[in-house]
Protein backbone atom coordinates (compact mmCIF):
# COMPACT_ATOMS: atom_id res chain seq x y z
CA UNK A 1 0.00 0.00 0.00
CA UNK A 2 2.84 2.36 0.82
CA UNK A 3 4.53 1.83 -2.54
CA UNK A 4 1.25 2.54 -4.31
CA UNK A 5 0.96 5.94 -2.64
CA UNK A 6 4.52 6.82 -3.51
CA UNK A 7 4.01 5.84 -7.13
CA UNK A 8 0.84 7.90 -7.40
CA UNK A 9 2.54 10.91 -5.87
CA UNK A 10 5.40 10.73 -8.34
CA UNK A 11 3.11 10.42 -11.34
CA UNK A 12 1.10 13.42 -10.18
CA UNK A 13 4.25 15.50 -9.84
CA UNK A 14 5.45 14.48 -13.28
CA UNK A 15 2.15 15.40 -14.91
CA UNK A 16 2.20 18.81 -13.21
CA UNK A 17 5.73 19.38 -14.53
CA UNK A 18 4.64 18.50 -18.05
CA UNK A 19 1.77 20.97 -17.76
CA UNK A 20 4.08 23.74 -16.58
CA UNK A 21 6.47 23.02 -19.45
CA UNK A 22 3.56 23.20 -21.90
CA UNK A 23 2.78 26.71 -20.72
CA UNK A 24 6.39 27.87 -21.08
CA UNK A 25 6.59 26.48 -24.61
CA UNK A 26 3.45 28.33 -25.71
CA UNK A 27 3.45 31.46 -27.83
CA UNK A 28 3.46 34.90 -26.25
CA UNK A 29 0.01 35.81 -27.57
CA UNK A 30 -1.33 32.59 -26.05
CA UNK A 31 0.15 33.49 -22.67
CA UNK A 32 -1.16 37.05 -22.95
CA UNK A 33 -4.66 35.79 -23.76
CA UNK A 34 -4.69 33.45 -20.76
CA UNK A 35 -3.40 36.23 -18.49
CA UNK A 36 -6.10 38.56 -19.85
CA UNK A 37 -8.77 35.95 -19.10
CA UNK A 38 -7.54 35.60 -15.53
CA UNK A 39 -7.48 39.37 -15.08
CA UNK A 40 -11.03 39.65 -16.48
CA UNK A 41 -12.16 36.81 -14.20
CA UNK A 42 -10.93 38.76 -11.21
CA UNK A 43 -12.76 41.88 -12.42
CA UNK A 44 -15.97 39.89 -12.95
CA UNK A 45 -15.71 38.43 -9.46
CA UNK A 46 -15.25 41.87 -7.91
CA UNK A 47 -18.16 43.27 -9.95
CA UNK A 48 -20.26 40.21 -9.04
CA UNK A 49 -21.01 39.67 -12.74
CA UNK A 50 -22.10 36.05 -12.53
CA UNK A 51 -22.60 35.46 -16.26
CA UNK A 52 -19.17 36.80 -17.26
CA UNK A 53 -17.51 34.99 -14.35
CA UNK A 54 -19.07 31.65 -15.29
CA UNK A 55 -18.25 32.07 -18.97
CA UNK A 56 -14.61 32.97 -18.30
CA UNK A 57 -14.26 30.04 -15.91
CA UNK A 58 -15.58 27.80 -18.68
CA UNK A 59 -13.02 29.22 -21.09
CA UNK A 60 -10.18 28.72 -18.60
CA UNK A 61 -11.38 25.18 -17.96
CA UNK A 62 -11.37 24.45 -21.69
CA UNK A 63 -7.87 25.89 -21.99
CA UNK A 64 -6.63 23.78 -19.09
CA UNK A 65 -8.12 20.65 -20.68
CA UNK A 66 -6.46 21.56 -23.99
CA UNK A 67 -3.10 21.93 -22.21
CA UNK A 68 -3.51 18.53 -20.57
CA UNK A 69 -4.45 16.92 -23.89
CA UNK A 70 -1.48 18.56 -25.64
CA UNK A 71 0.95 16.71 -23.34
CA UNK A 72 3.86 19.09 -23.70
CA UNK A 73 3.21 20.27 -27.26
CA UNK A 74 3.29 23.95 -28.07
CA UNK A 75 -0.01 25.76 -27.79
CA UNK A 76 -0.65 28.99 -29.60
CA UNK A 77 -3.34 31.49 -30.45
CA UNK A 78 -4.64 29.14 -33.16
CA UNK A 79 -5.42 26.51 -30.52
CA UNK A 80 -7.35 29.17 -28.60
CA UNK A 81 -9.17 30.19 -31.78
CA UNK A 82 -10.20 26.60 -32.43
CA UNK A 83 -11.33 26.20 -28.82
CA UNK A 84 -13.36 29.43 -28.80
CA UNK A 85 -14.95 28.55 -32.15
CA UNK A 86 -15.89 25.12 -30.82
CA UNK A 87 -17.46 26.65 -27.71
CA UNK A 88 -19.47 29.09 -29.81
CA UNK A 89 -20.72 26.23 -31.99
CA UNK A 90 -21.73 24.26 -28.89
CA UNK A 91 -23.70 27.22 -27.59
CA UNK A 92 -25.45 27.70 -30.93
CA UNK A 93 -26.49 24.04 -30.85
CA UNK A 94 -27.76 24.54 -27.31
CA UNK A 95 -29.79 27.55 -28.43
CA UNK A 96 -31.50 25.43 -31.09
CA UNK A 97 -32.42 22.82 -28.49
CA UNK A 98 -33.66 25.44 -26.04
CA UNK A 99 -35.83 27.03 -28.72
CA UNK A 100 -37.40 23.64 -29.46
CA UNK A 101 -38.24 23.30 -25.77
CA UNK A 102 -39.49 26.90 -25.32
CA UNK A 103 -36.73 27.89 -22.87
CA UNK A 104 -36.24 31.54 -23.79
CA UNK A 105 -34.48 32.26 -20.48
CA UNK A 106 -31.72 29.80 -21.35
CA UNK A 107 -31.57 31.08 -24.93
CA UNK A 108 -30.80 34.59 -23.67
CA UNK A 109 -28.06 33.27 -21.38
CA UNK A 110 -26.43 31.27 -24.18
CA UNK A 111 -26.57 34.28 -26.53
CA UNK A 112 -24.91 36.42 -23.87
CA UNK A 113 -22.18 33.81 -23.43
CA UNK A 114 -21.64 33.74 -27.20
CA UNK A 115 -21.11 37.51 -27.20
CA UNK A 116 -18.56 37.24 -24.39
CA UNK A 117 -16.67 34.46 -26.17
CA UNK A 118 -16.78 36.36 -29.49
CA UNK A 119 -15.22 39.32 -27.69
CA UNK A 120 -12.24 37.16 -26.66
CA UNK A 121 -12.14 35.54 -30.10
CA UNK A 122 -11.83 38.98 -31.69
CA UNK A 123 -8.87 39.84 -29.45
CA UNK A 124 -6.78 36.97 -30.84
CA UNK A 125 -4.21 37.86 -33.52
CA UNK A 126 -5.74 35.40 -35.97
CA UNK A 127 -7.02 36.08 -39.49
CA UNK A 128 -10.76 36.02 -40.00
CA UNK A 129 -12.46 33.35 -42.07
CA UNK A 130 -13.08 35.89 -44.87
CA UNK A 131 -9.37 36.81 -45.00
CA UNK A 132 -8.37 33.15 -45.17
CA UNK A 133 -10.96 32.44 -47.87
CA UNK A 134 -9.63 35.38 -49.93
CA UNK A 135 -6.04 34.09 -49.74
CA UNK A 136 -7.12 30.55 -50.59
CA UNK A 137 -9.22 31.81 -53.50
CA UNK A 138 -6.21 33.69 -54.90
CA UNK A 139 -3.99 30.64 -54.43
CA UNK A 140 -6.45 28.31 -56.18
CA UNK A 141 -6.93 30.77 -59.05
CA UNK A 142 -3.17 30.93 -59.61
CA UNK A 143 -2.83 27.15 -59.41
CA UNK A 144 -5.72 26.54 -61.83
CA UNK A 145 -4.24 28.99 -64.34
CA UNK A 146 -0.98 27.04 -64.38
CA UNK A 147 -2.71 23.63 -64.21
CA UNK A 148 -6.37 23.55 -65.38
CA UNK A 149 -6.83 19.92 -64.28
CA UNK A 150 -5.83 20.68 -60.69
CA UNK A 151 -6.84 18.09 -58.12
CA UNK A 152 -7.51 18.79 -54.45
CA UNK A 153 -4.50 16.77 -53.33
CA UNK A 154 -2.27 18.85 -55.65
CA UNK A 155 -3.59 22.04 -54.08
CA UNK A 156 -2.70 20.72 -50.63
CA UNK A 157 0.82 19.87 -51.83
CA UNK A 158 1.42 23.43 -53.04
CA UNK A 159 0.91 24.94 -49.58
CA UNK A 160 3.99 25.26 -47.35
CA UNK A 161 2.38 23.85 -44.19
CA UNK A 162 5.28 24.78 -41.93
CA UNK A 163 5.20 28.46 -42.87
CA UNK A 164 1.48 28.85 -43.63
CA UNK A 165 0.20 29.34 -40.07
CA UNK A 166 2.56 32.24 -39.37
CA UNK A 167 2.29 33.74 -42.87
CA UNK A 168 -1.49 33.49 -43.06
CA UNK A 169 -2.13 34.03 -39.31
CA UNK A 170 -4.34 30.94 -39.31
CA UNK A 171 -4.15 27.37 -38.09
CA UNK A 172 -3.52 24.56 -40.53
CA UNK A 173 -7.01 23.17 -39.89
CA UNK A 174 -8.59 26.54 -40.78
CA UNK A 175 -6.57 26.72 -44.00
CA UNK A 176 -7.40 23.12 -44.95
CA UNK A 177 -11.12 23.67 -44.37
CA UNK A 178 -11.02 26.79 -46.52
CA UNK A 179 -9.16 25.01 -49.33
CA UNK A 180 -11.76 22.23 -49.39
CA UNK A 181 -14.64 24.74 -49.36
CA UNK A 182 -13.14 26.92 -52.08
CA UNK A 183 -12.10 23.97 -54.23
CA UNK A 184 -15.65 22.60 -54.25
CA UNK A 185 -17.12 25.95 -55.28
CA UNK A 186 -14.54 26.58 -58.02
CA UNK A 187 -14.82 23.08 -59.52
From Swiss-Prot:
InterPro entries: Asn/Gln_tRNA_amidoTrase-B-like (IPR003789), YqeY/Aim41 (IPR019004), YqeY/Aim41_N (IPR042184). Pfam families: YqeY. Disulfide bonds: none annotated. GO terms for cellular component: mitochondrion. Its main location: mitochondrion. The keyword Mitochondrion applies. Belongs to the AIM41 family. This is Altered inheritance of mitochondria protein 41, mitochondrial. It comes from Lachancea thermotolerans (strain ATCC 56472 / CBS 6340 / NRRL Y-8284). The gene is AIM41.
Amino acid sequence: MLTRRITLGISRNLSRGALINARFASSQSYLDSVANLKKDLKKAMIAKDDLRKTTIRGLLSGIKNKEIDAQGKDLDEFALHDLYSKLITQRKDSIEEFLKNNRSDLVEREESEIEIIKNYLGQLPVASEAEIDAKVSNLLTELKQSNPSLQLKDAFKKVDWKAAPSDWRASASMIKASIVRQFKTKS
